[in-house]
Every structure is written in structure tokens, then in C-alpha cells.
């Protein structure tokens, strides 16, 4: 009985999360109906994502290069005392290291 209840709860949670994660978008305004704990919602890689500015900061990198330079992103994050979160197109995202 407990096993069945746990499976049911797991399926319920999984189905809710996949609906949120599967929301596609073309620009940031398509993500207005997504509920996030933060106010920053961005459309990246055609998916809506919630960004927490306390942990993630985006910096603009060389705009002539179509891809993010991973090593310069790592160096920048180290210089400000953070770790690399993701390097995507023209932006380097850093976050505070886990405790």
C-alpha cells in the first residue's frame, strides 16, 4: 500500500514537472504564464527557464564569436569568487559555489 502511494505521488510530481519544463517559447514574452519563485523568466534554447539572480549572473562575452569561450568563462567566474553554471551562446552564467 505504501509503495503504491509513493509511486502515485512520484508520477504526479513527475507529470507536473515535465509540463513546466516542456513549455516551449520563441521569446521571453511567451513565458509570462509560467509561475516561478523568482521574477526573472527567460526563454533559452526554446524553453522557459526561471533564473534566480542571487545565484546566477550573466555577463556578455565576445559578440564576434558565435559560441561562448568556456575557458574565459571559467576564469571570469573564478575572478569573482563563483563557479561556472553554464556557457551558452554569448553569455557566461556564474553562480555561488555550494556550501
UniProtKB/Swiss-Prot annotation:
Signal peptide: 1-22
Keyword Disulfide bond in record: yes
A GO BP annotation: defense response to fungus
GO cellular component terms given for this protein: extracellular region
Subcellular location as annotated: Secreted
Keywords noted in UniProt: Antimicrobial, Disulfide bond, Fungicide, Plant defense, Secreted, Signal
Disulfide bonds: 25-43, 31-48, 36-50, 68-87, 73-92, 77-94
Family the entry assigns: Belongs to the DEFL family.
Protein name, as recorded: Defensin-like protein 306
Species name: Arabidopsis thaliana (Mouse-ear cress)
